[in-house]
Regions:
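Non-catalytic peripheral regions of nucleotide-handling enzymes
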Residues: 1-191
Length: 191
């Protein structure tokens, strides 16, 4: 976990000032996480009012990241979809940014065909949709062990990882297919 915060002698009351402070805190968090070789999966901003109230905003990512701009976009999405908008009132004394969940993040080099960029774009889209709609509303298919072809896959919430499925084993070159290549409608008797 990583926590950084800013204290203000004069309470902060403007929304653009809050975003600027969050940008700075995200840059600090990125430096700390980079030193540890980690990336954040969950980010929590705590906005402390002068009257003692605390407003917390949490965003999560599908993969570890240190990209402050991407996390800031998620915070903007979260703020835009709040039922109760952020009211600074008399202002904020402290803004705290915490990373409660961090995982190892190895440096990644893109493939020669540019596939890494496409995978990152899909992961960013999933993060934005999960922030807008909720993490349980963004689904993906995983393999299941079943003898019925229509039950070979199941919908599960997107987590960004490969967990949750059995994975289809690769076919061996000399092995016949495990089921017919064509399903007849109506079914035909096997002779």
């Amino acid at each position: 976990a990583c926590v950084v915060e800013r204290h203000f002698p004069e309470p902060l009351q403007r929304a653009d000032g809050i975003e600027a402070v969050l940008d700075g805190l995200l840059a600090e968090v990125a430096r700390v996480l980079e030193g540890r070789g980690q990336g954040g999966r969950s980010f929590e901003a705590g906005l402390f009012h002068t009257d003692g109230q605390v407003r917390r905003l949490t965003v999560a990512t599908g993969r570890p990241t240190r990209d402050g701009a991407a996390v800031m976009r998620l915070f903007r999405e979260r703020i835009a979809t709040l039922a109760d908008p952020i009211d600074p009132g008399y202002g904020f004394d402290v803004i705290r940014l915490a990373v409660p969940l961090a995982e190892p993040l190895a440096p990644a080099a893109p493939d020669l065909d540019g596939r890494a960029a496409g995978q990152e774009a899909v992961a960013d889209l999933v993060d934005r949709l999960a922030t807008r709609l909720g993490p349980d509303r963004v689904l993906r298919l995983v393999a299941r062990d079943s003898h019925h072809p229509e039950r070979e896959a199941a919908l599960v919430p997107w987590t960004g990882g490969a967990a949750g499925g059995i994975g289809w084993p690769p076919a061996l070159p000399d092995e016949p297919p495990s089921r017919p290549l064509q399903i007849f409608d109506p079914p035909q008797p096997v002779e």
